């Protein structure tokens, strides 16, 4: 990392959020097609963005740039190296962002031109089902996978002293992680989620993920404001 980033060992690695080569849809489009040409149009181009207040407009621009997939990361997503105040207070919940993006792309008639992948606070199979029903084509996980592998959520990934040997290069710590055991735990997690998702879908009378995608009639809100329900496109529980 020190060599690649040209940062002296022991120094803070400051990674600013802005991409100073992207200030418009045209700039993004140029980058997207540069990547497509470099990969001979054989690899999908994914643009990942944080869930923020104007995410619907941002996603619309990404879809028009020619990207194949939009990955949306809800607040509380990210690495264990992120400052706690930033992780817990910056951004908006993935549910609101996802619903807003799906509705915007459908209204503009470009929903089928791009896939939506959701992440950030996806902690269980029920979170996956809710995300799919709100418009996601798929979900991705980070922290949930790490926990399955043995992560204790110490939130000190940047220190190089991960006591489970996951986020470190120190030989005395990496030897604590058994890759085969970690692999088995992760496989168990995903297989359990798969079974639970099937059970939840069966309870809703749905027999395929495709039939669940964007099917908000399957969802109801509890303890949500009228504005939140409007953005999510769902009814109060009991309605």
Region annotations inferred by a language model:
Residues 10, 55, 61, 91-92, ...:
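Glycine-centered secondary-structure boundary/capping sites
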Residues 9, 143, 190-193:
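Hydrophobic alpha-helical segments, principally membrane-spanning helices and signal/leader peptides
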Residues 7, 33-34, 183-184:
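Short, flexible segments with low predicted structural confidence
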Residues 6-9, 19, 24, 162, ...:
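Short capping/connector residues at structural and topological boundaries
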Residues 1-14:
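ATP-dependent carboxylate/acyl-activation modules
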Residues 1, 122, 196-199:
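Hydrophobic alpha-helical context, especially transmembrane and signal-peptide helices
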Residues 14, 19-174:
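Glycine-rich phosphate/ribose-binding loops and adjacent secondary-structure elements
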């Amino acid at each position: 990392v020190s060599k690649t980033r040209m940062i002296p060992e022991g120094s803070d690695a400051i990674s600013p959020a802005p991409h100073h080569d992207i200030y418009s849809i045209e700039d993004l489009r140029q980058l997207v097609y540069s990547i497509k040409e470099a990969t001979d149009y054989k690899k999908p181009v994914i643009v990942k963005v944080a869930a923020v207040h104007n995410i619907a407009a941002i996603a619309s621009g990404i879809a028009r740039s020619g990207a194949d997939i939009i990955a949306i990361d809800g607040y509380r997503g990210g690495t264990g190296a992120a400052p706690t105040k930033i992780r817990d207070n910056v951004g908006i919940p993935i549910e609101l962002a996802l619903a807003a993006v799906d509705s915007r792309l459908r209204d503009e008639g470009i929903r089928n031109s791009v896939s939506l992948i959701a992440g950030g606070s996806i902690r269980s199979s029920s979170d996956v089902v809710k995300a799919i029903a709100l418009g996601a084509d798929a979900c991705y996980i980070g922290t949930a996978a790490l926990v399955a592998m043995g992560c204790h959520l110490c939130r000190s990934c940047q220190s190089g002293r991960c006591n489970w040997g996951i986020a470190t290069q120190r030989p005395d710590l990496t030897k604590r992680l058994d890759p085969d055991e970690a692999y088995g735990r992760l496989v168990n997690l995903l297989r359990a989620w798969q079974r639970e998702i099937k059970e939840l879908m069966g309870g809703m009378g749905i027999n395929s993920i495709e039939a669940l995608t964007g099917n908000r009639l399957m969802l109801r809100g509890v303890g949500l404001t009228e504005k939140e329900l409007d953005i999510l496109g769902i009814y109060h529980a009991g309605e």
